[in-house]
Structures are given as C-alpha cells and as structure tokens.
Amino acid sequence: IKDSDEIYLALDPDREGELIAWHLVEICREKKLIDGKKFKRIEFPAVRKEDILSAINNPREINQNLVNAAITRRFLDRFFGYKISPITKRRTIFGSSAGRVQSPALKILCEKEKEIDVFVSKEFWDVNIELTDNRKHKIECTIVSQGQKKFDKFTINNEKKAKALQEAIKKENFSLNSLNKREKKRNPYSPFSNSLLLQDASSKLGFSPKLTNSIAQELKDGVGSLGALITYHRSDSNKMKSSEIEKLRKIINSEFGSSFLPDKPVSYKERSKFVQQGHEAVTPTELERKPSDIKTELNENQYKLYDLIWKRTFASQMSPSVSLETTYYIKSENFLLKASGSIEKFSGFKKVYNYSEKDNEAQTLPELQSN
C-alpha cells in the first residue's frame, strides 16, 4: 500500500463486503497510509475477465448506506445474542443460545408444535385403482362415486370399508365415459438466487443448506485449473446481465433449435423488494462450459451442483412446455372413477430441466377413446 497511489477494494458485492472495504480504509487512516492515495471500490459478481475489467474501468466510492446497514445488522446480532443468550443458557437444559434470526424462527416452530399438540386426528383411507388399457398402459384412478353416493376424503374411514370396496371394484368392468382436455403452458423457472439454490439442491439432490453453500463456495473459488465455475453464490437476485442473456439465447438456438427459444428474452421479477442492487443470479461463469465437459475434473457433489445450476440457467431462457391437462371419467355399472394427468405435447424448457416434482407432478396419461 505504501508504494501505491491507487488501491482497488474488490470485496464481495454485499453489505458485509462493503463494511470490510470501509474498515480497510479506516485502518489505513489510523496507520497514516491514506495521504495522497485514492481508494476505489469495485465489485464483480463473477471472476470473469470481462467483469473484472468492467469493474476496474467503473470504480465507485464506498456506499456508506450499505456500510451502515451492515453495522446495524451486526449490532442487532450482538444486541440479541449477548443480552438474551446468557438468560437462555441458564434456564434451558441444553444451554441454548438466542439470536436475531434463530429466536423468531424458534417461535414459529413452537407455534407449529402447539398446533400439532391440539390437532385431533381422524381416520381415513385412500383407495387408488390402477387400470390397464388394451395397450398395457397403466392409469391410476380415484373413486368419484358409488351409485348415488359421492366420495370425499373421509368417506372411507376404516379398513373394513376399504377392503370391501377393493373386492367390489375387482368385479367391475370399466370403460371411458367422458374426458376433459385443456392445453396448459408451463413457464420456465427463473435462474437461481441463493435461497432458491438451497431449496432445489435440498429437494432434488438431497443436499443440506450447509453442504450446498460449501460446494458452491468451491465452485466460485475455482476447482483446479478450471478457475471460477459459478458467479457469486450468496446473491439474493434471480436476474442475469443482459449481455449474458444474449449469449445464452445464442447457445440455446444453436444447441436446441429455434422452437426452444422464445421470441424475446424471458424476464423475471425479483422475489423481494429488499434485494441488494448489483447482484446477479447464481449462474455458470462460462455458459459454453457444459457439465459433461468438466465432469472428470470435479468430485461427485461438485458435478451434481454445477449440473443443477447449468440446467436451471439454460432452462430459464427456453420456451414454455406445452401439455394437455386431461381428466378421464371411467365408469362401470356401479362406480365412477376419475384419472387426472397430462399428455405432453412440447417439452420446451423441460428438455433441459425435467426434474420430477413427485407429489406435484401429474401422471402422464395415454391417449384413450370413449368406451
């Protein structure tokens, strides 16, 4: 620092990064190293050559509002933690601590636990019928009615009734009575913010939040000779730079064809009004770098997370999927059954990002003709 006229402060693009930059200037001031020197704050969401050069060419002053926000946040952490933790440690068996975030979260858990305690359970049974058409396609159905009696969730309220229905249904012959169809478009998901990444990595990969952030940090810092593989992973934004979107659209058109590319770039709203400005979504730093190209240089978990981020990023700018939402009403002499599901007409973004949603995913139905 003594031999430099200009000092670039390239900390993380968030409140904490701004506070660290401010502290560095203050330390230099205390050590009388500030005279005749210019301190310039730069930030870049990813370790990409164009981002770094752009940041150096467009430095700014330290944002005192962000510094104050970080100081306030730290004060609240310490105010709650230092004041309340000694009390909770004395009054609980396991020496629990308290905090600005964990205490409200604990209150929510306690309220939910109270709801569980006062809940009165009520027995009910599901009877799911699996039918097979003449082409060996399987269709899962539920009971709508038996004669004039309509079924609801609690109609079958004991095992005896369930088994009696099972035996009665086995004796019936079923045919398609009617069907309803409507076309449904499903839009792609936005690129990842940190919270969305944690949710998806948990549901689709079985990763804990701690593991996801740890692996994402490795991908951001760079693996071996690959350099940084993803952008800043603690971002609360789900937006991409326009230049990256244009690059992404060109790759999609080349790799998948024009039918998978919308006429205009897909735009997304921020999920919160408190999103820090300047952040980018969590995306690959080099969009051309396919997961398969670098699989041998990553460990298993690194590959899985990079693959998830890459697919989500590409899917975000692809065409909607199109399906026919279909309901079949299947009848016998005594029963009316219903089968709901979808018939895919165009995969769209699902060609890349087609993870099963399990309970939320409708069954894929075969085409059936009446009777």
List where the protein language model places each region.
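Toprim catalytic domain recognition across nucleic-acid enzymes
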Residues: 1-371
